[in-house]
Amino acid sequence: MRQLHIIFLIAVTLSSCARPGPETLAVVTPAPRAHTVEVLVATNRVPDTGKAGAYTAGRGDRLHYSEVTISIPPGHRPSKIEWPTARPDPKVSFAVIGRRDLTAKEFSILARGQAKSPAYGRAGIFVHGYNYSHQEALFRLAQMAADSKVPDRAILFDWPSQAEVTGYVADKDSAAFARDDLATVLAELSQSGVRPTILAHSMGAWLAVETVRQLSLMGKRDIVRSIDQLVLAAPDIDIDLLRKQLSVTDRLSKPIVVLASKDDMALALSKRLAGSAATAGSLDIDDPRTRELALKENLDIVDISTVPSLNGTNHDRFASLAAVYPQLRQGFSNPVAGTGALVLNGVGGAVSAPFRLGGSLLAQ
């Protein structure tokens, strides 16, 4: 009975806040000297024909590509999304100030960037998780891109989540439905010379790992090798399933990063719904089995349990790390760094290692 009560509280927390609707995607006039973020979008959602730039939860039979320019308000606080309450106002809220549809070729060219740019050929792909609408995924990526201040191209792979707490099973099917389309996007980027970093959250982590596994089984090693790094944030993946996936997946050039929290309430609900013993996103870095998993599967496991949560479920802490992403990337790209578990004691805080750490995670 106590477990059912906890599950009820989690569900209430996940669904209690008012959700932003497609009206937040209305294109408005930019404010003077506004900071902007350009996001490339690849989605297999069905477009909402009645609302420009909006998408439904329907599963589409083809990919749609676009470029969306988002204005960040002057008073923006790191890790927050200043949602508009009515018509978007760039002075106080995130706002779309430009949008255009793209062909697949245009998408790939824009993703590669200018030859003389320091970010040439570098991109970050965000694969959202369960219970996300198109606008929520779009603005979350814009927030992370704005906070990180890295020049890499921001790319959203948006799969058709129901954006409903009760849509867990449907979302699982939609994530599986999206595997081929994510593989297509990765192939297009690879052919254009783009080396992406993939940040996949929650159920999106399952989608990302499954897609890389699929590419490996198809012999598409060139595409797999083009991935600069794979970061799994609060991955909603059963531990046994993750082991099985990685056993037939070509090893990436860098360790796969797992951002985990022992107190992730959403993953606790997921485990209950799926009947799973443990998920990768709730690994305990003090457990010897976690050490074994990290060393065997080429993982860097980061405990982010002390990073502030944005909505009380402790499932969204990854968004708070965007501000220190350049330092995180520097730490993980250290060529002498070994795999093993890392402990992040808060944003910009100290790093300790219960078993192996080859290099500092955060540049001090």
What positions do the PLM features span?
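Gly/Ala-rich beta-loop-alpha elbow adjacent to hydrolase catalytic centers
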Residues: L182, A200-G204, A208
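Lipolytic serine-hydrolase domain surface
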Residues: A18, P22-D101, L110-G113, L138-A142, ...
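Sec-dependent signal peptide recognition
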Residues: R2-L9
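The conserved beta1-alpha1 loop
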Residues: I125-G129, H201
